[in-house]
From Swiss-Prot:
Protein name: UPF0342 protein GK0640
Recorded family membership: Belongs to the UPF0342 family.
Taxonomic path: Bacteria, Bacillati, Bacillota, Bacilli, Bacillales
HAMAP family attached to this UniProt entry: UPF0342
InterPro entries given in the database record: Com_YlbF, YheA/YmcA-like_dom_sf
Top-rank taxon: Bacteria
One Pfam family matching this protein: Com_YlbF
The organism of origin for this protein: Geobacillus kaustophilus (strain HTA426)
């Protein structure tokens, strides 16, 4: 990565870490960690998601009962106030990161578009 872009990426990382949405997410993780029930439910959902992701990466079929198990675990987790808050904050942070990525990719997208229009 060129030095100026690398420096800007580091500044962006620091800005994300210092942002209020990230700090809220960090506090939500700490709240879940301190609550044994919420932490166990979080770990269960994470484990199920990882197992399904691994199967998907291997090209293995995900069975309907596995999907149902994941949906039930997620529904149960969403009933926990701390986990529901954590998931909502994660979603917001993911959307923010996606918007930043979209902005960063704009020059490349414009280059591709102008290249294809030039034919």
């Amino acid at each position: 990565m060129s030095e100026p872009l690398h420096a800007l990426a580091k500044q962006l990382e620091q800005a994300i870490r210092a942002s209020e949405p990230f700090q809220q997410l960090k506090r939500a993780y700490e709240d879940v960690r301190r609550d044994e029930t919420a932490y166990r439910m979080f770990a269960n959902v994470r484990d199920i998601q990882l197992q399904l992701h691994e199967k998907q990466m291997r090209g293995a079929a995900i069975l309907p009962d596995e999907i149902e198990q994941a949906q039930k675990a997620m529904a149960l987790a969403q009933q926990n106030e701390k986990l529901a808050r954590l998931m909502a904050l994660e979603q917001q942070m993911s959307m923010t990161i996606a918007e930043v990525q979209q902005i960063a990719m704009k020059p490349l997208e414009e280059l591709h578009r102008s290249f294809m229009e030039g034919r």
